[in-house]
Amino acid sequence: EASRYLDYVQLMTYDLQGGFQKVTGHHAALYHSEGNLFDACVQKAVNGFVNAGVPMEKLILGVPFYSRKWDGVKGAGCRNGLGMEAETVGGYGGDYGELKESWIGKRGFIRYWDEQAKVPYLFDGETFISYEDCESLGVKIAYLKEKGMGGIMFWEYKCDPSGELLSFIKKNM
């Protein structure tokens, strides 16, 4: 009912897993993944709002320009660290600029792609990092266009100092 008084409803579809759990996972998965133990994803959030009566065209999809990081991952060989217990909760893991400069493909970190969830993650055998990149943004932009959503928003501008993610959004929206 409240949606009739609102121009848009911004869905903060990030931090879906992280700061409150000692189990690794995607903090902004588009779809549920078998490796992600908690059933939280963009699709489920969007469906929840639509089922509650919010028109699709009023929904704005939120994406993160920062990461979530778990240290001390146990059972590292399984699923490349996804869905595994860790010593720490998934705290702030740095912004996209930091990941590009110091983590992606460096320090022993390998970039993996979860084909079910449609998001990337990094793992070095002990540390798991969930983040957003241009590939996952492309899939989310296609999703929101297909669904007829109202647009996209992000958190936050300063986390993309090179403008790579923002430029990708501008080009593809």
Predicted regions and their residues:
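Substrate-binding surface in catalytic domains of secreted glycosidases
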Residues: E1-L99
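Glycan-binding loop/region signatures in secreted carbohydrate-active enzymes
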Residues: H26, V63-Y143, N172-M173
